[in-house]
């Protein structure tokens, strides 16, 4: 019997569902799919769906990776809308990626294809510590303070 998976949808814990839905729709460009008042909502942009749950599931400060077509253009758009950019678009081996923070401290890592021929930049970890790429792989503490 085949029990194939159909996909995965991250559930992000939020403190105020109404404010979070407004943020995801107005600032990040998601559409509201459905909402159970004051409890749970589904938002979608393109092929990315996220569930938002008020206080009951998970922990604040979740991380989600979202593939996008153009991280640089999206960065400019989100910055113009006043969205908190935790870390600007930076090249890594897996993607050209930025970190965006929602109203509740959840981090959305949004990335497009890596830039060929460009070295990997520094990384901002979950504690706000900067890391630099280590030759041969991994990360070392340190980096610029800016």
Feature-to-residue mapping (PLM):
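Vicinal oxygen chelate
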Residues: 7-15, 44, 55-81, 96-101, ...
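A short acidic/small-residue loop/turn micro-motif
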Residues: 40, 93, 113-117
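N-terminal beta-strand motif that seeds the catalytic metal site of vicinal oxygen chelate
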Residues: 1-21, 62-64, 112-146
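Generic preference for hydrophobic
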Residues: 50-52, 100, 110
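Core segments of cupin and vicinal oxygen chelate
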Residues: 2-5, 11-50, 56
